């Protein structure tokens, strides 16, 4: 599948093997996680907790968009990972995910969001021009 975006105007392209769309059945319906990673140890992920097929979803503290990276890829200590998220201060919506097609096998759409540093919400990144077209994994 393909998974691309711009993070603060820098190109982000998910490597083969890291691009995943996983649908899971939760007690209240379906959830989906869409993600991709780069050779520079960057990761973009969007999680919808109540996924209902095609349509537009707000990204916030319930449906979450994240951008994360390892500051020093030669030191893969998970404690050093820097995470930017749409959770922000827990107020309002900080982005949108649009699913243009979903047939149970393939999912396609676009996204954009502002991610706020989990350790310092005054720092943010802008994720724009997000696009994906991915084969779905069901769990």
What are these model-predicted stretches?
Residues 3, 10-15, 19-104:
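Surface-exposed helix/loop patches within compact recognition domains
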Residues 6, 37, 116-118:
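A generic structural motif
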Residues 95-139:
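C-terminal or internal capping secondary-structure element at the end of a domain, subdomain, or sheet
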């Amino acid at each position: 599948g393909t998974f691309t975006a711009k993070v603060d105007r820098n190109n982000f392209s998910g490597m083969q093997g890291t691009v995943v769309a996983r649908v899971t059945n939760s007690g209240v319906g379906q959830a989906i996680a869409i993600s991709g990673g780069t050779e520079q140890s960057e990761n973009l992920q969007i999680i919808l907790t109540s996924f209902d097929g095609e349509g537009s979803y707000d990204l916030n503290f319930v449906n979450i968009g994240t951008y994360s990276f390892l500051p020093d890829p030669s030191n893969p200590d998970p404690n050093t990972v820097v995470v930017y998220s749409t959770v922000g201060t827990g107020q309002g919506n900080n982005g949108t995910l649009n699913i243009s097609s979903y047939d149970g096998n393939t999912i396609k759409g676009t996204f954009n969001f502002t991610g706020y540093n989990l350790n310092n919400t005054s720092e943010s990144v802008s994720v724009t021009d997000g696009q994906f077209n991915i084969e779905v994994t069901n769990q």
